[in-house]
UniProtKB/Swiss-Prot annotation:
Name of the protein described by the UniProt record: Serine/threonine-protein kinase DCLK2
Start and end residues of each Protein kinase domain: 409-666
Name of the gene encoding the protein in the UniProt record: Dclk2
Top-level enzyme category: transferase
Composition skew (Polar residues), residue ranges: 327-338, 369-380
GO cellular component: cytoplasm; cytoskeleton
Keywords: ATP-binding, Cytoplasm, Cytoskeleton, Kinase, Nucleotide-binding, Phosphoprotein, Repeat, Serine/threonine-protein kinase, Transferase
Length: 767
């Protein structure tokens, strides 16, 4: 009853009770003996509520009350923000009991770390003529400007709502006619607008915010409007978005640029923008976001500045698709006779290398275009896949003209997207064995087909239990299909960090696997040139044993003479590569020695305290090898002796892969069974970012398969000796003359057998 009366008090006025005519309980008046007539005598309406205490009389009509209760709609702008379209608020006494409550709600909606960081404390009229201090001063349909403590900034806020894309424009004005005319002109030139999802990444320090925006005829009315939408979504620290750049560094200048080949853009503010390499390189987290965004897209494209430094090439999940490139790949398979080093050389960048928190390597940028010529459509039954253009198989296998990939293999989802190749799940229909189908788009390799051909020709020749095998090869006019062995056990670091027990004997077995693969390759006069833990994958067998398999032959080549191309990964690069005096097969032995050192202590033998590449190279050239205590106190002298032989700066004194296999520490199990898993794992995580636990070990194997020779261009680096142009000229002459190789390659040995001799949980394949 009390709540009902409180509501009625808002609409009725309490007055003194007057006696009704004829009422028995009426009291005579005390003034002059005269009596006051009833309510009708005063023209008042009797109260519907008859109480012993009071009566209520209606003073306002229901229409007036309804008008008072109706919310007033007003638009609020940010002070000085000419790109903010304004926010419409419905203001009613029920929603906002006080003016302060409105300020709190406006702060929540309009304030962030860039705009109004101190909150909304003042409201101006749209012309700045006065301040609003109460809810009653807010009028229906008017606009207001919100500010903190700063003075009013004079801006034509009403123009922020661009009439070119407003849906509520009222007709009848000259401005409206002009807008309508402009709309008709724009419609005539908007045939290029097709529905497209683009990703915009804010410039600045990583990790960077990325937003996805759908562009179509309803959302992309003008270039300025799209910029405004991006500004509102991306929220740059420096304010509004002034320019957009593709991952190639090209500035977007018109609406049509959004509908080209590029799908990823970098948003830049009003600050002077420096085109640094880091801004156009996506790190691992950004690539994951983009991969999830475009996993259902019909095509993907990779681009961006090359990574000039020596670094681990972690592959981001995207591929490149260049429109207009339709060069045919030669269907004839020439025998491997070695690719000259001059063919593998690429222009050397002068920019410094970059790194990300998750990986010391750089990433290519990601782009996406339409589905023209996309390999995934072909794999799923397109006409191109129904023809096997090359009758020549791999390792003696033949495929008939009528043979199709889909008849023999069941093709699954995409499990890896690289710069120049896409990797899909692949299962043999007859055996159920899993493989990885690597699809290389020839259009992306235009002008550099010899690099791919060199890599594939080497893969055709090698067949060893410690090397990832090329199972089958097929080809169409637009794509190259490689059925590869799929290794799911992770890389070398994963094998150590994920195990519960890791001993010196396990490390000995790992070195045996690596040396076995190197002896086989060197017997074919093939140098790998990129031996590192990331390219050593763990193969797990049904009986619980494991072995290492070497992959990623993008830098591999046949040694016909001294090589001068400066390439590799800094930690594992041999001194003769840095010195540029010519090198051969034994650069792989040096890298294997560095890996052996890391396997036993968790950190590399040569390292820079300041993380400077020049310091690292100086230490490698000096070759001063130390076994610091206490990390090496429990390691056998036999292991230290082998490492010292593998890390000889003098190439002639350095041991060969065959000598590694015959060393007692490797062949006679002269190693100990002491568990050093915790110590080695701790140092690995301290010195190697890629040694951190991975969510999916299969991803590591897919990344190795996904690499191509074209991805290795970033690992052809400029050493400190390359600054002398005269020496560079001399080296080019020496490379053309091709003097005899520094070491005599052994004749190819017989194919390795599949027998194994268990050593702990690690297999040792005997050649």
């Amino acid at each position: 009853m009390a709540s009902t009366r409180s509501i009625e008090l808002e609409h009725f006025e309490e007055r003194d009770k007057r006696p009704r005519p004829g009422s028995r309980r009426g009291a005579p008046s005390s003034s002059g003996g005269s009596s006051i007539s009833g309510p009708k005598g005063n023209g008042l309406i009797p109260s519907p509520a008859h109480s012993a205490h009071c009566s209520f009389y209606r003073t306002r009509t229901l229409q007036a009350l309804s008008s008072e209760k109706k919310a007033k709609k007003a638009r609020f702008y940010r002070n000085g923000d000419r790109y903010f379209k304004g926010l419409v608020f419905a203001i009613s006494s029920d929603r906002f009991r006080s003016f302060d409550a409105l300020l709190i709600e406006l702060t929540r909606s309009l304030s962030d770390n860039v705009n109004l960081p101190q909150g909304v404390r003042t409201i101006y009229t749209v012309d700045g003529s006065r301040k609003v201090t109460s809810l009653d001063e807010l009028l229906e349909g008017e606009s207001y400007v919100c500010a903190s403590n700063e003075p009013f900034r004079k801006v034509d806020y009403t123009k922020n709502v661009n009439p070119n894309w407003s849906v509520n424009i009222k007709g009848g004005t000259t401005r409206t006619l002009a807008v309508a005319s402009a709309k008709s002109e724009v419609k005539e030139s908007k045939d290029f607008i097709k529905p497209k999802l683009v990703t915009v990444i804010r410039s600045g320090v990583k990790p960077r915010k990325a937003v996805r925006i759908l562009l179509n005829k309803k959302t992309a009315h003008s270039f300025e409007q799209v910029l405004t939408d991006i500004t509102e979504a991306i929220k740059l620290d420096s304010g509004v978005v002034k320019r957009l750049c593709t991952l190639d560094g090209k500035q977007v200048t018109c609406l049509q640029d959004f509908f080209g080949d590029d799908d990823v853009f970098i948003a830049c503010g009003p600050e002077k923008y420096r085109y640094a390499q880091d801004d156009f390189v996506l790190d691992h987290s950004e690539c994951r976001v983009l991969k999830s965004s475009y996993s259902r897209a019909s095509a993907a494209k990779y681009s961006g500045s090359r990574s000039p430094g020596l670094s681990r090439r972690s592959k981001s999940p995207a591929s490149v698709k260049r429109a207009g490139h339709s060069s045919a790949y030669s269907t004839a398979k020439s025998p491997v006779n070695g690719t000259p080093s001059s063919q593998l050389s690429t222009p050397k960048s002068t920019k410094s290398s970059s790194s990300s928190p998750t990986s010391p390597g750089s990433f290519r940028g990601l782009k996406q275009i339409s589905a023209q010529g996309r390999s995934s459509s072909n794999v799923n039954g397109g006409p191109e896949l129904d023809r096997c253009m090359s009758p020549e198989g791999v390792n003696g296998n033949r495929c008939s003209e009528s043979f199709t990939l889909l008849e023999k293999y069941r093709i699954g989802k995409v499990i890896g997207d690289g710069n120049f190749a896409v990797v899909k799940e692949c299962m043999d229909r007859s055996t159920g064995k899993e493989f990885a189908l690597k699809i290389i788009d020839k259009a992306k390799c235009c002008g550099k087909e010899h690099l791919i051909e060199n890599e594939v020709s080497i893969l055709r020749r090698v067949k060893h239990p410690n090397i990832i095998m090329l199972v089958e090869e097929m080809e169409t006019t637009t794509e190259l299909f490689l059925v590869m062995e799929l290794v799911k056990g992770g890389d070398l670091f994963d094998a150590i960090t994920s195990s519960t027990k890791y001993t010196e004997r396990d490390g000995s077995a790992m070195v045996y696997n690596l040396a076995s693969a190197l002896r086989y390759l060197h017997g074919l006069s093939i140098v790998h040139r990129d031996i590192k833990p990331e390219n050593l994958l763990v193969c797990e067998y049904p009986d619980g044993t494991k072995s290492l398999k070497l992959g990623d032959f993008g830098l591999a080549t046949v040694v016909e003479g001294p090589l001068y191309t400066v390439c590799g990964t800094p930690t594992y690069v041999a001194p003769e590569i840095i010195a540029e005096t010519g090198y051969g097969l034994k650069v792989d032995v040096w890298a294997a020695g560095v890996i052996t050192y890391i396997l036993l202590c968790g950190f590399p033998p040569f390292r820079s305290e300041n993380n400077l590449q020049e310091d690292l190279f100086d230490q490698i050239l000096a070759g001063k090898l130390e076994f610091p205590a206490p990390y090496w106190d429990n390691i056998t002298d036999s292991a230290k002796e082998l490492i010292s032989q593998m890390l000889q700066v003098n190439v002639e004194a350095r041991c060969t892969a065959g000598e590694i296999l015959s060393h007692p520490w490797v062949s006679d199990d002269a190693s100990q069974e002491n568990n050093m898993q915790a110590e080695v794992t701790g140092k690995l995580k301290q010195h190697f970012n890629n040694a951190l636990p991975k969510q999916n070990s299969t991803t590591t194997g897919v990344s190795v398969i996904m690499n191509t020779a074209l991805d290795k261009e970033g690992q052809v680096f400029c050493s400190k000796h390359c600054r002398d142009s005269s020496k560079s000229s001399r080296e080019q002459t020496s490379a053309r003359e091709a003097p005899p190789p520094p070491e005599s390659p052994r004749p190819p040995g017989p194919p390795a057998t599949s027998g194994c001799d268990p050593a702990g949980t690690w297999r040792r394949h005997r050649d």
